[in-house]
From Swiss-Prot:
L-glutamate binds at residues 26-30, 62, 178, 196. Signal peptide: none annotated. One of its GO terms (cellular component) is cytosol. Catalyzes the tRNA-independent activation of glutamate in presence of ATP and the subsequent transfer of glutamate onto a tRNA(Asp). Glutamate is transferred on the 2-amino-5-(4,5-dihydroxy-2-cyclopenten-1-yl) moiety of the queuosine in the wobble position of the QUC anticodon. One of its GO terms (biological process) is glutamyl-tRNA aminoacylation. Its cofactor is Zn(2+). InterPro entries: aa-tRNA-synth_I_CS, Glu-Q_tRNA(Asp)_Synthase, Glu/Gln-tRNA-synth, Glu/Gln-tRNA-synth_Ib_cat-dom, GluQ/Sye, Rossmann-like_a/b/a_fold. It comes from Synechococcus sp. (strain CC9605). Belongs to the class-I aminoacyl-tRNA synthetase family. GluQ subfamily. The gene is gluQ. This is Glutamyl-Q tRNA(Asp) synthetase. Keywords: Aminoacyl-tRNA synthetase, ATP-binding, Ligase, Metal-binding, Nucleotide-binding, Zinc. A motif ('HIGH' region) lies at residues 29-39. ATP binds at residue 237.
Length: 293
């Protein structure tokens, strides 16, 4: 089935941005709470990679999962980045303002016969690292389970080299899935290099499968180290991390915080005080790339 004209225009706009040359990166936090130091460390690394390459760095807010969003978080994210000197290019991109385009892609994929309804419960899926394809394989007599709203999955060949299994594009609660929104946004805005936290490495197979299904080349995905708490657990916004406030209340300025973040990445000596701009001038592309895998 041919791609509708308005979706083709979106793809062509993204291709034009990529074809123009140059690095195009982004930072894409979700507004489920304040940015903790781990988020800010990733933001710094992403910003450094883009600026060292002389490229663009966009700020996208992944706010589709509205029940989890926290009031005031979008404004706080922007305020913290500005305070640290991590300036982005262009307007802030809100995924919540792009629901129409995501649903258009979902509708086209569904009409093309590339999606199927999945009524497996979370409990049934819990022991499947890769989806078994149960709902794809046959028509089942669901009985009362037919009343359960389905998720919609992309059919992925069993021999797909990315090993993702069938990818959820719309969740059973009706929300557009992270994978679909992310892939469409990378294409729409011509993103060609993504630096993000290592916890998102597990999203790579699904995203690469979706790029392949759309016939589009993925960006280069790279991952920076995670910042963990004293128990070795990844910091989480949902666990009421206080973000920058305790540091600012203790009298630390932006240079001290940038120094702490850069020291955690082994880019500067411990206790260094350095602004984001000074750090950028201090580092080579090789030094930044050495931290990213």
């Amino acid at each position: 089935m041919a791609l509708p004209e308005h979706l083709q225009r979106h793809l062509e706009a993204g291709r034009a941005l990529t074809a123009a040359g140059g690095y195009r990166g982004r930072f894409a936090p979700s507004p489920t709470g304040l940015l903790h130091l781990g988020n800010l460390q990733t933001a710094l690394l992403s910003w450094l990679a883009a600026r060292q390459a002389g490229g663009a760095w966009l700020l996208r807010i992944d706010d589709l999962d509205t029940p989890r969003n926290r009031a005031g978080a979008i404004e706080a994210i922007q305020s913290d980045l500005r305070w640290l000197g991590l300036k982005w290019d262009g307007p802030v991109l809100l995924q919540s303002e792009r629901r129409g385009i995501y649903h258009s892609w979902l509708s086209w994929l569904r009409r093309s016969g590339r999606l199927f309804a999945c009524r497996c419960s979370r409990r049934e899926l819990a022991d499947q690292p890769i989806y078994s394809g149960f709902c794809r394989q046959a028509v089942h007599n669901w009985g009362w389970q037919r009343q359960r709203l389905p998720s919609w999955r992309l059919r992925v060949a069993d021999d797909d080299p990315h090993g993702s299994g069938d990818v959820v594009l719309r969740r059973a609660d009706g929300f557009i899935a992270y994978q679909l929104a992310t892939v469409i946004d990378e294409l729409s805005f011509g993103i060609n290099d993504v630096v993000r936290g290592a916890d998102l490495r597990e999203a790579l197979p699904a995203q690469r499968s979706l790029f392949a299904a759309l016939g589009e080349a993925p960006p280069r995905f790279r991952h920076g180290p995670l910042l963990c708490d004293a128990s070795g657990q990844k910091l989480s916004k949902r666990e009421a991390c206080a973000g920058l406030k305790p540091l600012r209340d203790a009298g630390l300025d932006a240079a001290a915080v940038i120094g702490r973040l850069a020291s955690g990445l082994q880019l500067v000596a411990p206790e260094a005080r350095i602004s984001a701009t000074e750090l950028l001038e201090h580092l080579t592309q090789q030094a930044i790339n050495a931290v990213i895998s």
